[in-house]
């Protein structure tokens, strides 16, 4: 099976790539395991060199259809769509957030539709699609009420993927990820970046500012 990871040079993309290579197989459309033959990592920058002949990298703009057409062919059995502009940056730069989080996602789905081979598309959405007061247990059908541009873009992309799946163009799956903590390196532009900083920075002997009150509740997932 040929597998594509968008955002393949990012924190989660690199970890996912490493895990897929270790595993060496994925479940195919018939429910049986298929050997991982090729792993394509697409991002705007080059990632780590895995030293594995199965890995290839495409450096380019995911919003460019020509780049996606290079990355996706009829042998691409699974796509992990991780590429995104994070929450704080999407709020600060509306056009960039729309271009990458929404327009590029639709272009990816359109390339899949044009290929006509119905690949599995796993889309990493976010709990930012929710908002306001939530029930104690959040269900799959809990109403979406995004309160940021990032959350709205993720919610719209979810609906697009569901409709492309309903029409039989792709086999779509959505994962609504919470805040991932602790991320290594310097803080990114995510609104929840402090959730890593309040742990990471003190461990490095550095000061960290927590911009939210102690009563704040967060969903967290360890990498």
Question: What would you call each of these model-derived segments?
Answer:
Residues 1-26:
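N-terminal Rossmann NAD(P)H-binding glycine-rich loop of SDR-like oxidoreductase domains
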Residues 6, 42, 79-83, 121-127, ...:
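SDR active-site strand-loop-helix element
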Residues 22-41:
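Short mixed-charge
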Residues 59-100:
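NAD(P)H-binding glycine-rich loop region in Rossmannoid oxidoreductase-like domains
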Residues 63, 92, 96-107, 144, ...:
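Glycine-rich NAD(P)-binding loop of the Rossmann-fold in SDR/ketoreductase-type enzymes
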Residues 103-147:
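Conserved Rossmann-fold NAD(P)-dependent oxidoreductase catalytic core, especially the SDR/UDP-sugar
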Residues 132-134, 147-173:
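Active-site Tyr-X1-5-Lys
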Residues 162-217:
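NAD(P)-dependent short-chain dehydrogenase/reductase
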């Amino acid at each position: 099976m040929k597998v594509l990871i968008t955002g393949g040079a990012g924190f989660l993309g690199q970890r996912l790539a490493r895990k897929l290579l270790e595993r060496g197989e994925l479940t195919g459309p018939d429910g049986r395991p298929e050997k991982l033959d090729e792993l394509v990592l697409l991002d705007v920058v080059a990632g780590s060199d895995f030293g594995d002949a199965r890995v290839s990298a495409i450096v380019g703009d995911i919003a460019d259809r020509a780049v996606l057409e290079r990355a996706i062919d009829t042998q691409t059995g699974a796509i992990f769509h991780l590429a995104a502009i994070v929450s704080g940056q999407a709020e600060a730069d509306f056009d960039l957030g729309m271009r990458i989080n929404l327009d590029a996602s639709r272009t990816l789905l359109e390339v899949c539709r044009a290929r006509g081979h119905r690949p599995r598309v796993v889309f990493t959405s976010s709990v930012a699609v929710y908002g306001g007061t939530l029930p104690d247990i959040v269900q799959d059908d809990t109403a979406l009420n995004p309160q940021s541009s990032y959350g709205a873009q993720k919610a719209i992309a979810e609906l697009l993927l569901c409709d492309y799946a309903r029409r039989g163009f792709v086999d779509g799956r959505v994962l609504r990820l919470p805040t991932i903590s602790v991320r290594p390196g310097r803080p990114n532009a995510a609104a929840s970046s402090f959730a890593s900083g309040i742990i990471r920075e003190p461990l490095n002997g550095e000061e960290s500012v927590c911009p939210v009150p102690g009563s704040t509740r967060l969903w967290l997932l360890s990498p």
